[in-house]
Amino acid sequence: MKKICLLIVAFCLVLLTGCAPQNDASQSSGSSGAYAVVTDDRGTVVTLARKPQRVVVLSTSLLNFAAAVDGDLAGRATVKAEDGSLPEKYQQVPDVGPVYNVSLETVLACQPDLVIASADHHEKLAAQLEESHIPVLVLKTKTYDDVKRNLEVIGKVYG
């Protein structure tokens, strides 16, 4: 009986250890005093000095991640009927254009302090935004692992 109890306690400790927060160098704020430091799917380290207040999301699939963590937006990509329904929270958020043809000028007019972009469509636009000193997270959405990682990264961004 003691062996079974000891085994159960050991198993519970292993489970609790697995649930403890991990120090992930790619997503910890460290001692730099930054709000968050994340690495996007280009391998670019994006440092956010403070919690973003004016986020623009350039992809409808990435918009779903922002909605999942109840994030506020300053701008969003056009959502077509076939892409799914737009959460009510984002109905009045300015539209920056369709995923394949986002307007740089409209994005800049939103005065974003962070842009979340798709690796499939926005590499060139990301470079232009970064030239304007706007932090850009470029994320993939192809695999299940991408989906899990995106939820973690966007959750970190929104706190």
Predicted regions and their residues:
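Loop/turn elements at helix/coil->beta-strand transitions in domains of secreted/extracellular proteins
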Residues: 53, 72, 111-113, 132-135
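Early extracytoplasmic/lumenal segment of secretory-pathway proteins
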Residues: 37-47, 96-108, 124
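N-terminal hydrophobic signal/anchor transmembrane helix of membrane proteins
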Residues: 52-71, 144-158
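Extracellular/periplasmic catalytic domains that process cell-envelope and extracellular macromolecules
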Residues: 48-49, 108-109, 129-131
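Solvent-exposed, acidic/flexible segments
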Residues: 56-59, 100-101, 118-122, 140-147
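A short, structured surface patch at a secondary-structure boundary
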Residues: 60-110, 114-119
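Extracytoplasmic substrate-binding proteins
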Residues: 35, 45, 114, 124-159
